Amino acid sequence: INLYNQLAKHKLFNKTVNFNLKRIKLALVKLGHPEKKLFNVIQVIGSDGKFSVLRNLRYFIEGNKQTVSTHVSPSLVDIKERFWMGKKYLSHKEIRISIKAIEKLKIPLTIYEVLTLVFLINASKTNTDFVIQEAGCLWRLDSNNVIDFPIKQVIVNINKQHLNFLKRKTLNEVILQKVGFL
């Protein structure tokens, strides 16, 4: 059985979209704040082109003989594609170990929050020169938005994608939710 499907069937984790940072912040406290151990964080925010920009930044950094951890979503074929740690993808075993640690917290989380925590736990142990995160569908309340001081935020094209998650359906509201300011 595929690891993502196992998560989807888990009693504590769910597939629903629920934009709220309270759950992940509580989990981070209980995990000892792995996000505070990350330095040189670059966040890629917006609607279209985030993955391409992230991948190009990764290749640029690696081309300059520096290491980078990246978190992308969704994965194309295998869940481990979401987690690049320096010179390799996380293995299924490493992902499962992190999920077990998250399960022990007994906090109901979304699958996206669980996968964000998997990344933060492992990136905090990897000690790379840079960390690059791809934002989820709405940045302001996205579980990746827990880094206090990223060194850069790269904003790509913003459009009216994911309007179904917003009360007001204006481009200004989309910009506010996707970028968190402006």
Which residues make up each language-model segment?
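ATP-dependent carboxylate-amine ligase catalytic core
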Residues: 17, 21, 28-30, 34-38, ...
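Conserved beta-strand/loop subsegment of P-loop NTPase cores
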Residues: 152-159, 182
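Membrane-proximal helix-turn-helix segments that form the acceptor-binding/catalytic region
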Residues: 175-182
